[in-house]
A protein has these predicted regions:
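Short catalytic/ligand-binding loop motif for oxyanion handling, primarily in non-cytosolic enzymes
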Residues: 40-44, 194-195, 227, 260-261
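Structural signature of PLP-dependent enzymes
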Residues: 281-300, 306-335
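Active-site PLP attachment segment
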Residues: 235-279
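Hydrophobic/aromatic beta-strand patches that form the interior of the parallel beta-sheet core
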Residues: 32, 102, 133, 155, ...
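N-terminal "arm"/small-domain region of PLP-dependent enzymes with the aminotransferase-like
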Residues: 2-88, 290, 296
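Walker B catalytic acidic pair
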Residues: 222
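Conserved core of the PLP fold type I
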Residues: 53, 58, 63-217, 225-239, ...
């Protein structure tokens, strides 16, 4: 057939995953993958906590569970428990019925749904610049999500200071102070990717003060609640603080890391509003029907089962604490090894943050 394909002029897209493929093809015996995103056990593979494994087996053999589609917003019990996990059971937003949640296809799906909601309905009755501010650096996929959603201006606020190996607080505050009114600001409550450097509670108070003064809208990510500090409350403190101040908030949650459900794409989007909740909820439902119709059930059932049972919840929390402690011990061992080898450079930042990520400052050479 001589006819040309209608896709003949399609260029190759750049992909951050190409580095992983190159790594797999590299035959060097001493290669090291510094771009891993999963929590790995001692044998170098992802794993489940014993509790999660047990519950997955129970669900798989439960004769009362039948294959059926979930509601558009997912499993109601999962959404209720995920909301309480992020905001706390005594949250004023929950008590005042000012919040709704949507089970999503991973945290990526939560960010995409939130971006679609904001792009379509945020400040729809006023002149809006269409600006979203991301941290510099941040995961490249976040910028692509907002661009593909149609945001006119994807901008960045300064976050990482290579000289101090920590958060560049002065630059961050300056950039937010000068952001256009009603800009959306994407922030990490904990587990900042890719630096691992999180804001302290006092720093969060300053950021929240600027957002209130400048009419900025917080879109907050919680990628691994409980796995950064070992405390569910501490890792979600930023979201709870913003809600306590009366700010409207979108919050994207992931249950991949803290439950080990990497291949099951269990995410959740929280919407905390001051008013007009039912109308926004109806628009979210319409968007979900065009994005994935309804989410999968298995991983969400695991999460709902753990969070709704006090004994399971306590056991899961203990497992998270052990994982967080192990992450810190690995950091300390690496830091000590580099010190003993007299490796050039400053490695103190390895032991500063918690969680899975760390910015070690290596360049391409």
């Amino acid at each position: 057939m001589s006819a040309r394909s209608v896709f003949v002029d399609t260029p190759f897209a750049s992909s951050p995953m190409k580095f992983i493929e190159d790594y797999k093809l590299d035959a060097h015996p001493n290669k090291v993958n510094l771009a891993g995103r999963e929590y790995l056990a001692e044998h170098g593979q992802t794993t489940w906590l014993p509790l999660i494994r047990k519950i997955k087996q129970q669900i798989a053999t439960d004769p009362t569970l039948i294959p059926e589609y979930t509601p558009v917003f997912g499993i109601p019990e999962f959404s209720r428990r995920a909301t309480e996990l992020a905001l706390g059971t005594d949250s004023p937003a929950i008590l005042q019925s000012r919040v709704f949640g949507v089970q999503t296809v991973g945290c990526t799906g939560a960010v995409r749904l939130g971006a679609e909601l904001l792009r379509t309905w945020f400040c729809s009755g006023s002149s809006w610049s269409g600006s979203v501010f991301l941290s510099s650096p941040c995961d490249e996929s976040l910028a692509e999500i907002f661009k593909s959603t149609g945001f006119e201006h994807v901008r960045y606020y300064r976050y990482w200071d290579a000289k101090s190996s920590g958060v560049f607080m002065d630059g961050l505050l300056h950039d937010l102070e000068n952001a256009p009114d009603h800009s959306v600001v994407l922030l990490f409550a904990s587990g900042h990717s890719p630096t691992g450097a999180d804001l302290s509670q006092e720093e969060w108070k300053r950021v929240a003060e600027v957002m209130m003064k400048r009419n900025l809208f917080p879109f907050i990510l919680i990628p691994a609640q409980g796995l950064c500090s070992g405390s569910l409350e501490q890792d979600a403190w930023a979201v709870r603080h913003c809600v306590s101040l009366g700010l409207e908030v979108l919050c994207a949650q992931s249950f991949s890391h803290n439950f080990g459900l990497y291949g099951e794409r269990v995410g959740h989007l929280l919407c905390v509003l001051r008013q007009n909740l039912l109308a926004v909820q109806s628009q979210a439902e319409r968007l979900v029907q065009t994005l994935w119709s309804c989410p999968s059930v298995d991983g969400a059932r695991v999460v709902a089962t753990v969070l709704s049972n006090p004994a399971h919840l306590a056991e899961w929390q203990e497992g998270l604490k052990a994982m967080a402690v192990r992450c810190m011990l690995i950091r300390e061992r690496l830091h000590e090894r580099l010190r003993l080898l007299a490796s050039p450079g400053c490695w103190g930042n390895i032991i500063k943050p918690g969680g899975l990520y760390c910015c070690i400052g290596l360049n391409g050479d």
